[in-house]
């Protein structure tokens, strides 16, 4: 995503495949392991499941030693798409498509704080959009 100052801002979101709701969504100036871990921490605080399977692409942030160990320490089973096969991660790709086309691309953000605040609330917004407006 582009910030109001023209620089890129990266998003990491976690969705629940059961109802397609966004459990956690976080922005950062860098697409790195810290962004992935911090997003996962938010998800773990919101949802208290005894077993969690986290499916992602093979981005360096998800394959890093720190993230793999974070998952092990929190009893999270990692699942990853095959390299170069975005269809394995279709629900997440669809989420980002909806997020960008219906919210990000039609909203004028005056500053980064506003962009981040909306992103933190995206779980509620997307759930309502998918389950009330579309259905």
Region roles according to the model:
Residues 1-135:
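Charged DNA-binding/catalytic regions of mobile-element recombinases
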């Amino acid at each position: 995503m582009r910030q109001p100052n023209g620089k890129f801002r990266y998003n990491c979101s976690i969705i629940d495949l059961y109802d397609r709701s966004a459990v956690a969504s976080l922005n950062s100036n860098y697409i790195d392991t810290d962004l992935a871990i911090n997003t996962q921490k938010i998800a773990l605080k919101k949802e208290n499941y005894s077993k969690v399977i986290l499916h992602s692409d093979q981005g360096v942030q998800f394959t890093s030693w720190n993230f793999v160990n974070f998952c092990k320490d929190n009893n999270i089973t990692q699942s990853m798409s095959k390299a170069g096969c975005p269809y394995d991660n279709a629900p997440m790709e669809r989420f980002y498509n909806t997020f960008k086309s219906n919210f990000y691309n039609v909203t004028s953000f005056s500053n980064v704080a506003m962009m981040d605040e909306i992103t933190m609330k995206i779980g509620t917004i997307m759930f309502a959009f998918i389950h009330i407006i579309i259905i």
